[in-house]
């Protein structure tokens, strides 16, 4: 029986899991919808919902707490200026997880995790390497 065991290890060290969820949280805040495996999506949801709850209260202290977890100043700014006010009146339940079939290579169950009232235009925005103009 697995009583009192919470969360999954994903065959990673604690530091690797922490970094993985920080990166996935930043990606979800940036694009407002990501595709990942179902177990990762299930473990990512409480992490992101706690960040959104922090984003509803804009103070120096909550910004520092969010920065300690996200490690991305632009995503912290979006969390407090866009997402926090958007979910100000909602008492939780900011994310939804929808099953998205199975991955081709290893048949792993996939899921789409997204914000409930997401901005449709945010998906894929500013993704990929930045374009640097050559001054030749």
From Swiss-Prot:
Family annotation (Gene3D superfamilies): Ribosomal protein L17 (3.90.1030.10)
A single GO BP: translation
InterPro entries in alphabetical order: Ribosomal_bL17 (IPR000456), Ribosomal_bL17_CS (IPR047859), Ribosomal_bL17_sf (IPR036373)
Pfam families: Ribosomal_L17
Keywords, in A-Z order: Ribonucleoprotein, Ribosomal protein
Stated family: Belongs to the bacterial ribosomal protein bL17 family.
Record text on subunit structure and interactions: Part of the 50S ribosomal subunit. Contacts protein L32.
Listed name of the protein: Large ribosomal subunit protein bL17
UniProt source species: Methylobacterium radiotolerans (strain ATCC 27329 / DSM 1819 / JCM 2831 / NBRC 15690 / NCIMB 10815 / 0-1)
